Regions:
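A short acidic, Gly/Pro-enriched loop at the edge of an enzyme's catalytic core
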Residues: 247-260
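Conserved SAM-binding motif I beta-strand of class I
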Residues: 214-219
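Feature captures hydrophobic
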Residues: 1-175, 181-185, 211
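Conserved SAM-binding strand-loop segment of SAM-dependent methyltransferases
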Residues: 235-248
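Conserved class I S-adenosyl-L-methionine
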Residues: 191-198
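A short glycine-rich, Lys/Arg-flanked "PGG" loop and its adjoining helix->strand segment in the class I
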Residues: 273-288
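Substrate-binding/catalytic lobe of Class I Rossmann-like enzymes that use SAM or dcSAM, i.e.
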Residues: 295-393, 397-403, 411-412
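Conserved SAM-binding loop of SAM-dependent methyltransferases across substrates and taxa
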Residues: 201-212
Length: 413
């Protein structure tokens, strides 16, 4: 029963002792004698309702409540995936600052190195990357669009990071600044044709289409396709939507595009060589590709993300490997810049928006979906804040025929 273990739990329970030891190691001074300020005091409530402070003096930043035996077993295993699932299922509750709680992730382990070996490596090889993408993308992006629209920016509904001048700047202004940057950096003008890879809920299609640009947005998500078709009809945009995988896209009877924009889709295109070859086929010589992505170790996704957020072989951009593949092509790297803080702010603002809609989300879609996404967004914010993940944007230029000079690097940061 759910109370059998609870009755046996006391303040001397091994979990309390182990948590205190791990917290002490996490907050111990480093080689320079500086304490880890990320480790915060928190309160642990056991199933018998006894409360135990973990950490030093001061007000607890958050409270972990163990609700059931399953929650006790998950936390006692110090298994990150098990703890995440216990939280989503209601076997663990957390009150207070979730971002502060996630700064204690180093006390947990992710002991599932081979759990997703099949979906990451073997399944795309056996069944084909394109076919598996169609299933994997649906698992995330075909959640009811109204759910996403509750917490994305209200102006463009962008699901990629923004560019912020101040930490307290609105999500809407940060997103619009990034879109303007990509638009201008690619030299896009009214009447030109632009390919938008993974159009989402019509963010770039709307931004550029309202300026007279003929945008072709590619998607393999049903919800995305429906949203963009409705947007085009409602606003009278000179744009089109193509339901096709980018790697299979072969337009017939049309010239190459004047620009290609890839907002946060590189993570879903892990075959860099094939992707760059497709860029080269679809882009006019002398024109540019804008892309941005979160970056880090290739296939270095936590088990929670691989199982519950982005299934399959979605992978952070591996900058070293990507640039090595670019070097094999005619493309020139014009701009590359670090966006880690911008991505942190984007995830933080999304998470805050979602938390503000907590009651509505739970009423319409259930507690599990709410907790899955709030945990995902705050854990992503934590990864960017701590440097577990980074992010970059890049501009590539395809030289015109007979070009005698390289474009040159305008920015590296």
């Amino acid at each position: 029963s759910q109370t059998s273990t609870a009755e046996a739990v006391t303040g001397d329970h091994p979990l309390v002792q182990e948590l205190r030891q791990r917290h002490a190691r996490l907050s111990a001074p480093d080689d320079r004698g500086e304490r880890n300020e990320r480790a915060r005091t928190f309160e642990l409530r056991l199933p018998d309702r006894s409360a135990h402070v973990i950490g030093g003096p001061g007000e607890p930043a958050f409270t972990v409540q163990i609700v059931t035996d399953k929650g006790l077993a998950a936390l006692s295993a110090f298994d990150e995936l098990a703890v995440a699932e216990a939280y989503m299922n209601g076997d663990l509750d957390l009150e207070g600052d979730l971002l502060a709680a996630l700064k204690h992730r180093p006390v947990l382990a992710d002991p599932h190195p081979f759990k997703y070996l099949y979906s990451t490596y073997l399944e795309p090889l056996l069944r084909g990357q394109v076919e598996r993408d169609k299933t994997w993308i649906k698992s995330h992006y075909d959640v009811d669009r109204d759910f996403f629209l509750l917490w994305l920016d209200s102006r463009l509904r962008a699901y990629s990071h923004g560019f912020f001048e101040r930490d307290d700047e609105s999500l809407e202004d940060g997103m619009e600044r990034k879109f303007r940057y990509a638009f201008d950096a690619c030299g896009i003008r009214p009447g030109q044709r632009v390919l938008d890879i993974g159009g989402g809920w019509g963010s770039f299609l709307q931004f550029a289409g309202e300026q007279g640009v003929r945008v072709t947005s590619i998607t393999i998500s049903d919800e995305s396709e429906r949203t963009m078709r409705e947007l085009i009809a409602r606003r009278g945009l000179p744009c089109e939507v193509v339901k096709e995988h980018f790697l299979e896209y072969k337009p017939v009877g049309s010239e190459p595009f004047d620009a290609i924009v890839n907002l946060g889709v590189t993570e879903h295109l892990p075959d860099y060589r094939r992707t760059l070859a497709q860029y080269q086929r679809l882009l006019k010589p002398g024109r540019r590709v804008y892309l941005d992505a979160y970056s880090g170790a290739r296939h270095g996704m936590p088990s929670f993300i691989s199982k519950w957020v982005f299934q399959g072989n979605t992978s952070p951009l591996n900058l070293e490997k990507y640039l090595a593949e670019v070097a094999r092509t005619p493309f020139e790297v014009v701009v590359i810049k670090n966006d880690r803080h911008n991505y942190f702010l984007s995830c933080k603002k999304w998470a805050e928006n979602l938390e503000a809609k907590r009651d509505e989300v739970i009423a319409r879609w259930g507690r599990h979906l709410y907790r899955r996404f709030v945990l995902y967004l705050w854990s992503a914010a934590n990864s960017f804040e701590t440097g577990m993940l980074s992010a970059h944007h890049m501009i590539l230029q395809l030289p015109a025929p007979g070009s005698a000079h390289r474009a040159g690097l305008e920015s590296w940061a």
